[in-house]
C-alpha cells in the first residue's frame, strides 16, 4: 500500500498544448503541458524534413564516401589535373 501524502497529484486527462492549441491528452502530474514541437508539426513526421548543409558538410561526406553527383566528380577531376600540372 503506498504511503499517503507523498505522491504527486495524478491528472489522467492532462492536456498537451502546442501553440495555444490542445493537440492531445495524456496522464501526467500537471494539468497542462506546454510543448513547442510534437509529432503533428515535427518535420521528420510530416515528411517536410530538409537537410541543412552547414559549411558544405553534406557534400564533403558525399565526396569522401564516393556518393558524389556527376557535377562534383567533374570538379574533382579538374582539380586533380591542375595539381598534376603544377
Curated annotation (Swiss-Prot):
Pfam families: Ribosomal_L31. Keywords: Ribonucleoprotein, Ribosomal protein, RNA-binding, rRNA-binding. Residues 73-86 have a biased composition (Basic and acidic residues). GO terms for biological process: translation. GO terms for molecular function: rRNA binding; structural constituent of ribosome. The keyword Signal does not apply. Residues 65-86 are annotated as: Disordered. One of its GO terms (cellular component) is ribonucleoprotein complex. Part of the 50S ribosomal subunit. Belongs to the bacterial ribosomal protein bL31 family. Type A subfamily. Binds the 23S rRNA. This is Large ribosomal subunit protein bL31. The gene is rpmE.
